[in-house]
Design a protein with these regions (language model features):
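Conserved catalytic-core motifs of GNAT/GCN5-like acyltransferases
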Residues: 100, 118-133
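Conserved acetyl-CoA binding element of GNAT-fold acetyltransferases
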Residues: 58-78, 134
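Conserved acetyl-CoA-binding loop-helix of GNAT-fold acetyltransferases
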Residues: 73-89, 110, 114
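Short amphipathic alpha-helix that is part of the acyltransferase structural core
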Residues: 1-24
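Active-site rim helix/loop that mediates acceptor-substrate recognition in acyltransferases
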Residues: 18-37
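Conserved beta-strand-loop-alpha-helix junction that forms the acyl-donor binding cleft
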Residues: 94-113, 126-127
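Charged interaction scaffolds used for protein-protein
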Residues: 31-34, 41, 57-59, 80, ...
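Conserved beta-strand in the GNAT
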Residues: 39, 44-54, 60-63
Length: 139
């Protein structure tokens, strides 16, 4: 379903990197206008959202916000994550798709590998809280 910030008001977000942004809902609203984004539902409840911000021709950065409910279905979420990334890459004509992952969030890093991303670099003090982040890419 097309993304709406109202969906996020119904998701129990526990991602430290999202919550570190004081106005994270406003940030998502702005990003949602920059490129395609969708919300995934289970039993009429939003559980995950994906978005893509074009940087320039052929390159975009993806974002994802998930709920604790989404983690109850790891196989489904991983297959969905791969499919959404594939669809975005094809439909947007991308030769590079990138994400940032908080360096201390090993669960998110592992999931990024599972959906086809590889580590490119460490971005020192990149986060809003001064934490290091990984730049991960998918070609």
């Amino acid at each position: 379903m097309p993304f709406s910030v109202a969906h996020m008001e119904r998701i129990e977000v526990d991602q430290e990197e999202v919550l570190a942004h004081e106005n994270w809902l406003k940030m998502l609203e702005v990003q949602s206008h920059a490129g395609p984004c969708v919300t995934g539902f289970r039993l009429l409840k939003p559980v995950i959202a994906f978005g893509f911000v074009p940087i320039w021709q052929g390159v975009a950065e993806a974002w994802m916000v998930g709920s604790a409910d989404a983690r109850k279905y790891p196989i489904t979420m991983t297959k969905t994550g791969r499919a959404v990334m594939d669809i975005a890459k094809i439909s947007m004509g991308l030769h590079r798709l990138q994400i940032t992952v908080r360096n201390t969030d090993k669960r998110a890093e592992s999931w990024a590998y599972a959906i086809g991303f590889g580590q490119e670099s460490v971005m020192k003090k990149y986060g809003p809280d001064g934490e290091d982040y990984l730049m991960m890419t998918r070609f």
